[in-house]
Amino acid sequence: MSEEQNKTLISAAKGGIVEAIKGVGDVAGALVDVISGTLVKTLQGTRAVGAEMTGLVKDTVTGTVQGVAEVGGEVGSAAKGIVLGTLRGTKEVGIGVLDTISSTSSAVIKSTAEVGGDVVTSAKGAVEGAIVAAKELGVSITEAASTATNAVIKGAHAVGSEVGHTTKAVLVGVCQGTKEVGANAMEAISGSASAVIKATADTGGDLASTAKKAVEGAIAAAKEVGIDVTEAASAAATGAINAAGEISASVGAQVRDAVVGTISGVKVVIQEPFKKEP
């Protein structure tokens, strides 16, 4: 796809969002329907495959974020609807759900930063949207949450956002999303904490500090949504340790030291056994 075609698609998505929001004044409601409809129309009318198809999705997300910003909407708060609408739209043309979650979550973070929006809030919303969509589409909620988490953590690093704050927000998004769809929060918390560590390792970040932030986020989120705080802390810590142990024994020990003990007033107990390097 040419650069001119990219600009046209971004402009079309932006225009559609602006008109829809002006017409109903409901940013959240307009987002899901407009982005879903735009993608169905665009993707059904193209022969694009693979990377080009992914590019079309990213351009649509970019235009949507720009549209929300233009009408004065809070881009961070709109992230959930953007991810949900994108996944509903791409479902109609058979694009893989997890691939779409990854590319969409990444595009949301990048576009949010470009318009000066709240990247941390966008990260939370992207994960929530991925979980809600996964429930609708019959995909593993834990895999969806982990995929979105990996994408937003890497995205936050790429745009220079504070990864620690993003990590905490992601865990809040996991707990709120699983509560909304009635899913097992502990599995998703553990999976997302693991994804945080893997993404942080890939970007050269501080694994011990990030692991602790993940546990702090799980604790804060558990209190907010009314689930067992100790279990949530344990799930996050165990997920982080398992992922770190897959990198190396020394990294696993480093992360374990960071998350064992009392964090945010909660005694963190690890779910044994966790994976160790031979």
Predicted regions and their residues:
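Extended, low-complexity, charged alpha-helical tracts
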Residues: S2-P278
